[in-house]
Amino acid sequence: DVCTDTPRDFLEYGGARELALSASCPEAGRLIYRNKEKMKVVEKEISEPFPWKETEDEQVLADEILFARNQAITILQNRSICVEERVCACLEYAKKVQDCLNQDSIVDIHKIPTEPYFYDTTDVEKESESEEKQYGLFLERMRLFSSLESIRTEWDELLLRFQKRYMDSEEGRQQYIADRKAYDDMLNNVNREYEKEQLIVYYCFLCLARCVDDYDFLGKMKL
């Protein structure tokens, strides 16, 4: 009841109200990872009136963004290819959606062909992440995490362990690359790749619809 009444993620748009747990919540983590089946969003109609009336343009935007989010999630759940390829395909699709938003062609979002992203990835531009790029992205994330205000000592201790193990030395860089490879191999070898998929899909659900406010669909996909 507490999570329903005071959810960490709350969004109203297009005549709908979306409630969700923060992905950092232990209960959310249990729900995200407990099943191998593809994640689904549960919708139900309630009698409560919507607090305001959307304009026609706002409703069109909401409908198109919801459609695009659903398409992105479907691409990410295409288990015929590996998660990394699905992410690349989804980013390519997001670029097309962003082009429509930038060109004020919102009504054309649902016209974007999606077949290449579902069935054939040969035409999708892919950039293989080198070990150096992976490590560079890790350093960027660490700089961001270190700039956030901490509310728990456990977070400070975790960052410190990461810094000691992976940063400020060539040995740390090599250790990160080795640990990253071991982690990826572990997930793939024990059939746990679905865990990556579930988390990415959950964040897409949380973030993508929020572009109804700032029109930054691609930016939120990159998150």
Each language-model region and where it sits:
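Hydrophobic, aromatic-lined core segments that form the binding pocket/scaffold
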Residues: 80-223
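Internal, well-ordered alpha/beta segment that forms a basic, Gly-enriched binding/recognition surface
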Residues: 2-91
